[in-house]
Regions:
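Conserved phosphate-binding/catalytic region of the ribokinase-like
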Residues: 1-29, 51, 174, 224-325
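Structural motif
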Residues: 27-29, 150-151, 209
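Active-site metal-binding loops of divalent metal-dependent hydrolases
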Residues: 33-34, 157, 277
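Conserved phosphate/ATP/ADP-binding segment of small-molecule kinases
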Residues: 172-181, 186-258
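Conserved N-terminal subdomain of the carbohydrate kinase-like
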Residues: 45-50, 72-154, 324-325
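Active-site-adjacent beta->alpha loops and helix N-cap segments on the catalytic face
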Residues: 162-168
Length: 325
């Protein structure tokens, strides 16, 4: 791993953050999930029957989304996640290769690929997730994949699963010990209630930073106010960034005062993947020497790009049309 950058944008060696092979930018390593996203939009569902709507298929998974947005921002990206030896796995591998995202391990796992069903009905989103091959994260492979990283993203999802918790925790700890900018993302608020969220907090304390949206922060702390929640979380993990949608984010470090960082005004088309784009922008700015508040500003700017298009990944264009319309 590459030591953390100082305020001048240089790491502990006195050199700029390490560039990824084949990329002009630093290498962001993302640990977590690779999924097929199936997005269903309908005004209302007919229980037990058919209804007209739209169905979109595309690559996803929180860590994969972060990697895709890191590449869109000009950085290198390495994804540590599982894919199955099936049609979905081959499609996902092709999507990663098209964007220049390195996948570790390169070999498919002996199971189906992960999938996420997103149903948007009357303005509400519901999710059904099957982690599939992502349950096959190996601790030694995960830690080995961190070599050369200028920054590290650890999704909360593998921390919330007993099968992958040790590997994700090891990634957070290795990054923290190396002094590399690293974050743990809180994943999803329904999964964090009570003691269930403790592995996420423990890993974030090792990495030094927790990213959470308003609902996740409230679930972890009991405080609905983002500023109060950020302060409570920062006292536990070091730095907390609470995302608040169009209102921006609140950043708090240690025992300091929470600092609001506004988001750019933009017309939102699809908020899917916005938090993951934020994470990519935040980490790349931290790797370049920005402080937490400055990095949060960079994150909101990349998130603004994400909400201006459909899908969790920045779309390639094929024949003038978006790959994922």
């Amino acid at each position: 791993m590459t030591p953390t950058a100082d305020a001048g944008g240089r790491n502990g060696t006195g050199r700029p953050p390490q560039a990824a092979p084949g990329s002009a930018g630093p290498l962001l390593v993302c640990v977590g999930d690779l999924m097929v996203d199936v997005a269903v939009d309908a005004p209302a569902l007919a229980r037990g029957g058919d209804v007209a709507g739209s169905v979109r298929l595309g690559p996803g998974g929180s860590a994969a989304n972060v990697a895709a947005w890191a590449r869109a921002a000009g950085a290198g990206a390495r994804l540590v996640a599982g894919r199955g030896d099936d049609l979905a796995g081959r499609l996902l591998a092709a999507a990663l290769a098209e964007r220049g995202i390195e996948l570790r391990p390169a070999e498919p796992a002996p199971s189906a690929s992960g999938a996420l069903l997103v149903v948007r009905e009357a303005g509400e989103r519901s999710f059904v997730a099957d982690p599939g091959a992502n349950l096959h994260l190996d601790l030694r492979q995960v830690v080995g994949a961190l070599a050369g990283a200028a920054a590290v993203f650890v999704s909360g999802y593998p921390l919330l699963r007993p099968e992958t918790r040790a590997a994700a925790m090891a990634a957070a700890g290795a990054a923290g010990r190396a002094g590399v900018p690293a974050v743990v993302d809180a994943a999803s608020w329904p999964l964090l209630a009570g003691e269930a969220g403790q592995p996420v907090l423990a890993a974030a304390a090792l990495a030094g930073t927790l990213l959470a949206n308003r609902d996740e922060a409230a679930t972890l702390t009991g405080a609905p106010d983002p500023g109060v929640a950020a302060a409570l979380l920062a006292a536990t993990v070091g730095t907390a960034v609470v995302k608040w949608g169009a209102a921006g984010v609140v950043v708090c470090t240690g025992n300091g005062r929470p600092r609001p960082v506004p988001a750019p005004a933009t017309g939102a088309v699809d908020v899917t993947g916005a938090g993951d784009a934020f994470a990519a922008g935040y980490l790349l700015a931290r790797a370049g020497g920005a402080d937490a508040a400055e990095a949060a500003g960079a994150g909101t700017r990349l998130a603004a790009r994400a909400v201006a298009t459909h899908g969790a990944w920045p779309a390639l264009t094929i024949g003038g049309r978006p790959e994922y319309p």
